Amino acid sequence: MIEPKCARCPDRPCSRGLPEGSPLPGFCPIQNYKSLIDEVVKEYRGPAVRDFYLAAALTEKNGYDARAAREEGRTVPIRPRIRELAEFARAIGARRLGLAFCSGLHDEAGRAAAILEKHGLEIVSVICSCGAVDKTEAGVPAEHKIREPGAFEAACNPLVQAEILNRLEPSFNILVGLCVGHDMLFTSRSKAPVTTLIVKDRLTGHNPVASLYSRYYRDIV
């Protein structure tokens, strides 16, 4: 089986449509996974996916200036992601959303919740330190603590965050700054779909693409 390497593709012909016989890179999944693609695309019309998929398409469309897109062929963004989350929730008829956040981003989580509530949504939120569990109770060796090994240091508790929100049955959950790995544990345990508002990057002010663009990060990545 040939592994896809789309991140290395120089032309992205799939984003422009493919006339019959168009040349494709050898690693292109369009030619190596054609039957799989044809089969899975049918699922977007099915009841399990259709509403989410159409709402996502509408949210994407409404995120751009309509006149610039239709008349000038330009994609000019007009909404930030937090607004798109509110509009997407409205499009799927959501009333309650879950918010799982890192204690280090408590202020940002509060601001996000307030904005979403302004749009008429009910927000249920759970902090990562919920439970006040010391890291050693969760199996982390004391020497792996960030500060003093003998002092209390709250363990991140993504499974508890997910399980509490599972019982509250939000339409979807929003992540705000969970650590690498903890975000994966939360996502794997959450029964509701999960999206991310803020991805944690301590060094860049939670803007991980900065380390891809700036030469100042070159020696530390």
Question: What name fits each language-model region?
Answer:
Residues 1-221:
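An N-terminal assembly and electron-transfer interface module characteristic of large anaerobic redox
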